[in-house]
Amino acid sequence: MRYIRLCIISLLATLPLAVHASPQPLEQIKQSESQLSGRVGMIEMDLASGRTLTAWRADERFPMMSTFKVVLCGAVLARVDAGDEQLERKIHYRQQDLVDYSPVSEKHLADGMTVGELCAAAITMSDNSAANLLLATVGGPAGLTAFLRQIGDNVTRLDRWETELNEALPGDARDTTTPASMAATLRKLLTSQRLSARSQRQLLQWMVDDRVAGPLIRSVLPAGWFIADKTGASERGARGIVALLGPNNKAERIVVIYLRDTPASMAERNQQIAGIGAALIEHWQR
């Protein structure tokens, strides 16, 4: 019997801590779900190893909303690396090409924008028309989904254009991902050979320059910490963020948080995501 116990202990000692987490971050998530009367999906992943550090509903589907724009620009950069696209190429468009919330692209109807400028607008300002113009260059929603399949993401799917993709109907699988799939895809884009080192740096810099994520994790970030992120929002009870975080101004972990099916206001959704981020950071610093 003593031999059996020793074998069990030895076996347990070798098991990976793939989904282990302290109660504190998970307790905050449970509280957020209760206060939001909705669902929260979250994953915290080590950037270097891909190991999952914390997870909650990580394999459930959530609307991507504008977080898809990071993957979109990753697909654009893959085309640049392949010689099929140039960041300096100018794209011209018309008034009828503009959709709601296009704070950058609406100012350049006369002169157009380069592919690189459109990516910057899509990520840093979440410009919807910029995203649609870029989406057209990769073959539309079906083309972006095909890119995801090519890099090994068999879960994430884009079905519609801006702004319909933000509809976030309960139970609708269109335009969704899972926290685990989004984190794994982001890690592939930023650390594997899917993109050149130059394109990886460019994608990360666009996320660093995000100007519309202030009320979320950036609001609780300690001094000297690194963050690069992209948010998403829907009028129908959803919110999300994909981020890279780390102390000493270094990206060390990927954090993906999605909310759905909540009647809470946008301010409350922001507050809850910030609270989850704060709990993760506090646990990290222990």
UniProtKB/Swiss-Prot annotation:
Catalytic activity as recorded in UniProt: a beta-lactam + H2O = a substituted beta-amino acid
Additional notes on this entry: The class A beta-lactamase family has a specific amino-acid numbering system, sometimes called Ambler or ABL numbering and often misspelt as Amber. A multiple sequence alignment was used to derive a consensus sequence and then the consensus was numbered taking into account insertions and deletions. This allows use of identical numbers, e.g. for active site residues, despite differences in protein length. UniProt always uses natural numbering of residues, hence there appear to be differences in numbering between this entry and some papers.
Active site: 66 (acyl-ester intermediate), 164 (proton acceptor)
One Gene Ontology MF term: beta-lactamase activity
Binding site for substrate: 230-232
Name by which UniProt lists this protein: Beta-lactamase SHV-2
EC number: 3.5.2.6
